[in-house]
UniProtKB/Swiss-Prot annotation:
Gene transcribed to yield this protein: murD
Organism: Campylobacter jejuni subsp. jejuni serotype O:23/36 (strain 81-176)
Pathway(s) it belongs to: Cell wall biogenesis; peptidoglycan biosynthesis
Name of the featured protein: UDP-N-acetylmuramoylalanine--D-glutamate ligase
GO molecular function: ATP binding; UDP-N-acetylmuramoylalanine-D-glutamate ligase activity
Localization per record: Cytoplasm
Statement: the UniProt record of this protein carries the keyword Cell division: yes
Function: Cell wall formation. Catalyzes the addition of glutamate to the nucleotide precursor UDP-N-acetylmuramoyl-L-alanine (UMA).
GO cellular component: cytoplasm
EC number: 6.3.2.9
UniProt-listed InterPro entries: Mur-like_cat_sf, Mur_ligase_C_dom_sf, Mur_ligase_cen, MurD
């Protein structure tokens, strides 16, 4: 059986490295490969022009591999890593949505690791590196993965709210939503799907539990929010994690949940040498995440760094939302001019900075002790950085130099 891997990302590299003895050598296709070479394990590294669909039995893409790529268009036996590993996948919980996937996955694993749960997927560990004998896989599941998945399904599907994101990849918001909901048609009567109320009528055999907001979800599962130390925008993530625990174990471990430590890059607060507040929210790459951040600091004047790769999303609603705040904007990245245009139409004051270091320095000229400087860019980072984490790291380095 000849397996072709599309893209040389974390997912496909893990398959190539961990399964070469069982299924390899693999043919790995990536636009960065100009000449045919072999890696140290004997896998072939090939240019996409060399792909012959008649000589390939299975094609597995990296999750973010675009549907319009010529390899995807030519493939006849395409399947996601979820489909590829489904036959050995233990019971699983899939967590998706636009914002909060990572935090909810980490919180749920924190609550359930004592029963042998492990986490992976979009967060940290590819499926090829997960223990197939673990009691439970808790998988952060992206819309990219769901787009390519047609066989695998979880025992529990926890869907957080959906808002516009990755539209240039999916083609439209409706396509994005449909990919998020696609797994429901494969679930059966023994499975559970937790869904925003707006999607409550989506056909599925699974037992559906719909919710309107974090308060409603808490009521549905008998969760006392007063016992949870996390506040919005992380409260919904915490409630969802407890809901998953409730379904599986019929317990609610508030103390264990409250011992969870948030990861960096999400509303990460730091002070400069003048005791002024700066917030690293580099992971806020869409409008709903930025709205949540703005609401958190609504009682302060906000100096917002915004911009980057906007992924083809119309951010007009976000800028209309900003009219409710005492706010000044600092535009960066490839979308600088677009951000300035949005700001002008919304009658918001904005500075043309283009690069992050200049934005930090400009804010420093205006920021007062009772105000907040917020990096919550509403855009991806790859126009100027290798990752959102690198963007956050550079932001903190700039602040520490003040």
């Amino acid at each position: 059986m000849k397996i072709s891997l599309f893209g040389y990302g974390k997912t496909t590299r893990a398959i190539a490295e961990n399964l070469v003895d069982k299924f390899g050598p693999f043919d790995i296709y990536d636009d960065h490969f100009i000449e045919t070479k072999k890696d140290t394990l004997g896998n072939l590294l090939l240019n996409p022009n060399d792909f012959d669909d008649n000589l390939s039995d299975i094609e597995i893409p990296s999750p973010g591999f675009p549907p319009k790529h010529k390899l995807i268009q030519k493939a006849k036996n395409l399947q996601s890593e979820y489909d590829f590993f489904y036959d050995i996948m233990p019971k699983s919980v899939w967590i998706s949505g636009t914002n909060g996937k990572t935090t909810t996955t980490q919180m749920a694993t924190h609550l359930l690791s004592h029963i042998g749960a492990v986490m992976g997927g979009n967060v940290g560990t590819p499926l090829a590196e997960l223990d197939p004998y673990a009691k439970l896989w808790i998988l952060e599941t992206s819309s990219f993965t769901l787009h390519y998945t047609h066989k695998a399904k979880p025992e529990i599907y926890a869907l957080l709210p959906i808002s516009p994101d990755h539209l240039s990849w999916h083609g439209s918001f409706d396509n994005y939503v449909q990919d998020k909901l696609s797994v429901l048609k494969r679930m059966n009567e023994c499975d559970v799907a937790i869904l925003p109320k707006i999607y409550a009528n989506t056909p599925t055999k699974a037992h559906k539990i719909s919710y309107e907001d974090e308060k409603d979800l808490a009521v549905k599962f008998g969760i006392d929010t007063e016992k949870i130390s996390f506040k919005s925008p992380f409260l919904l993530d915490a409630i969802m994690a407890l809901a998953i625990e409730k379904i599986l174990l019929d317990t609610l471990s508030y103390e264990l949940l409250n011992s969870f430590v948030m990861e960096k890059n999400k509303l990460e607060e730091l002070k400069d040498s003048q005791n002024r507040l700066w917030v690293n929210d580099t992971k806020a790459t869409n409008e709903s995440a930025v709205m949540a951040a703005l609401n958190r600091y609504k009682d302060k004047k906000i100096h917002l760094i915004i911009g980057g790769d906007d992924k083809g999303v119309d951010l007009s609603n976000l800028f209309d939302f900003m009219k409710n705040f005492n706010i000044e904007l600092y535009a960066i990245g490839i979308s600088t001019e677009k951000m300035l245009d949005y700001a002008k139409k919304a009658n918001l004051k904005a500075y043309k900075c283009e690069v992050l270091s200049k934005a930090v320095n400009e804010i420093s000229n205006h920021l007062r002790v009772n105000e907040v400087a917020l990096l919550s860019p509403a855009c991806a980072s790859l126009d100027q950085f290798n990752s959102y984490a690198e963007r956050g790291k550079v932001f903190k380095e700039c602040v520490n130099k003040i």
